[in-house]
Amino acid sequence: MKLETICGVDVEVAQSEADLRAIYGQPSELARRKSLTRLDRHCQDFIAKSPFLCLSTANATGDADLSPRGDAPGFVRVLDEQTLLIPDRLGNNRIDSLLNLTTNPHIGLLFLIPGVDETLRVNGLGQVVTAAPWLEEMAVNGKTPRSVIAVQVREAFLQCAKALKRSRLWSNDYRVDRQDVPSLGQILFDQIGCATPVAELDAAIETSYRDRMY
């Protein structure tokens, strides 16, 4: 352990696996053995039913990024047990994840299914494909994605339900009134101090949501 100070508080920080194992112990045999090197039928079925995933990448220097991806269930296509495709739909053109993959192919995915507390974790190597028959095949409403992320699967396993059960994610227990959270236009106005009025920002955002989904 290493002694450090965080926000004026003296703390001990783990520096190795040995430090962590001294606190957590070893995983169970089931937890160790559940990691697969391919997408079996259960993983493929989970992906087919999932309308949402979180996509994790990092650049060449290790700066991490996490991006949400969502569409109708089945929007992620499984080509075989080792390969899946994620279409890149219209966004704001920051393309953080795509830029990261050009210098560091390592990628992590977390698939969710509404109403199911377990999640699916997939890790592997990603490539940004800009020309292939897949792009046309993954078009929606006549709109073709400009690229597809092809993932070579190295690891896949189901995550237990504890996190989603604790958060009660699929129930209304912690649901907030939308009016209790500032609009995106208001937040951007406060954060970057732009001259555009909040109402105009919100209107532009809603127009983008309506006209630029695909």
Language-model features and meaning:
Residues M1-Y214:
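Binding-site signature for planar aromatic cofactors or substrates
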